Amino acid sequence: NSYSIAAHEVTNAEYLAFINAGGYEDFRFWHSDGWEWVNTHQVKSPMYWHYIENAWQHYTPKGLLPLALNEPVCHISYYEAYAYAAWAGKRLPTEAEWEVASNKFTWGKRWEWTESAYLPYPGFAKAAGAIGEYNGKFMINQMVLRGASEATSAGHSRYTYRNFFQPQLRWQFTGIRLAESI
């Protein structure tokens, strides 16, 4: 199927438009589990964002700094990424779409959420015994992220690497790249 994928990750400025448009208060953009998560935890913005004295600030390793509007949005959950994509009239790319297109855009600043559940590759067979049981636990309720981040070791920074997190986690350096079917 034909699709297009954004040349850049969603920026803080673009994500701020979602917040200002009431994106965190509009259930139409959220998975039902995501909507429950937002309301239960009273989520109103990405992790480490703080609205202080009429300006958005971002807590960083260097302390609290003004939000860098042109930087990729960071520390968001799959639920937030999905809702932003729905609000923007787009979608998250699948894992396969991201990998096929990855030579056409710059990646590596943020782990990028995909619309793909973390499942074994075709033909995968779980090993017998404890190792199989241990590995099998990771393939439950996880979503795939592709790319790498500024904090990723060189050995894991490759376009084929599959990372995975639970959809509610706002893990280190997670971001958004949009796709759409054409």
Residue spans of the language-model regions?
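Short, well-ordered junction/capping motifs at the entry into regular secondary structure
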Residues: 69-70, 74, 96-107, 116, ...
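Cytochrome P450 core scaffold surrounding the K-helix E-X-X-R motif
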Residues: 12-19, 24-31, 114-129, 153-154, ...
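Disulfide-stabilized, aromatic/cysteine-rich ligand-recognition loop
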Residues: 3-4, 8-23, 51-82, 86, ...
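Signature tryptophan residues that serve as conserved aromatic anchors
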Residues: 30, 49, 87, 98, ...
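Short beta-alpha connecting loops at secondary-structure transitions
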Residues: 129-132, 163-164
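Structural signature of nuclease core domains in nucleic-acid processing machines
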Residues: 91, 101-104, 110, 154
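Short acidic-hydrophobic catalytic motif
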Residues: 6, 33-52
